[in-house]
């Protein structure tokens, strides 16, 4: 983060637990709490924010943050658990979007600059840790719900990124979701570097959607 080193100016942070955590946790796992009144940011406050503050101190400037979920709360999912895939139950799409907005506001309330979100980390992966599957159709259906929630919460400057998975299928996912209605809602396509080269997919995205990051 130091300008004398690599000079990183962005970080990606998980919402709720992920595979880097010692145990699974949720800020609000209470199905009865539709208003998120018992939303508890303390795990992030205690375990993540100190590292973020240290990174910002090393950088000498605010870092731009991307927030990504590994899984919605277990009760919102078809399999009733955070791990082993499952999908977001459609009836909880609106509440899940508000949950993500709440995370953004908690970071902002502490002076951190959230720049963007992805809709789901690795939406094709079924893992033994926190994971949630979105088909093309499911991610496309959730996109306008999330976009509307951001606007409703005064967060319409937050960028939405699709995919957030390996780059060999990035163009396939982008082209399945983006049309004249959804394209203005999306700022970019997030890619992981895990498998092979497949750089042509990034070239195809750049050619077909030159405005995307």
What are these regions (language model features)?
Residues 1-114, 140, 144, 148:
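N-terminal catalytic cores of secreted or lumenal carbohydrate-active enzymes
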């Amino acid at each position: 983060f130091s300008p004398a080193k690599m000079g990183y100016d962005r970080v990606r942070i998980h919402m709720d637990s992920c595979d880097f955590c010692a145990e699974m946790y949720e800020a609000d796992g209470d199905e009865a709490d539709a208003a998120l009144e018992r939303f508890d940011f303390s795990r992030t406050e205690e375990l993540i924010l100190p590292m973020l503050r240290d990174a910002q101190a090393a950088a000498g400037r605010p870092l731009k943050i991307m927030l990504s979920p590994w899984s919605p709360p277990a009760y919102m999912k078809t399999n009733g658990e955070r791990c082993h895939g499952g999908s977001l139950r459609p009836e909880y799409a609106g509440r899940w979007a508000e949950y993500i907005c709440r995370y953004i506001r908690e970071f902002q309330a502490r002076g951190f600059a959230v720049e963007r979100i992805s809709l789901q980390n690795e939406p094709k992966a079924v893992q033994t840790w926190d994971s949630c599957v979105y088909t093309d159709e499911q991610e496309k259906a959730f996109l306008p719900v999330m976009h509307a929630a951001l606007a409703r919460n005064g967060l319409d400057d937050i960028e939405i990124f699709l995919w957030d998975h390996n780059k060999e299928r990035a163009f396939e996912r982008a082209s399945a979701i983006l049309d004249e209605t959804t394209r203005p809602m999306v700022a970019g396509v997030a890619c992981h570097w895990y498998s092979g080269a497949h750089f042509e997919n990034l070239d195809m995205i750049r050619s077909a959607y030159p405005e995307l990051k």
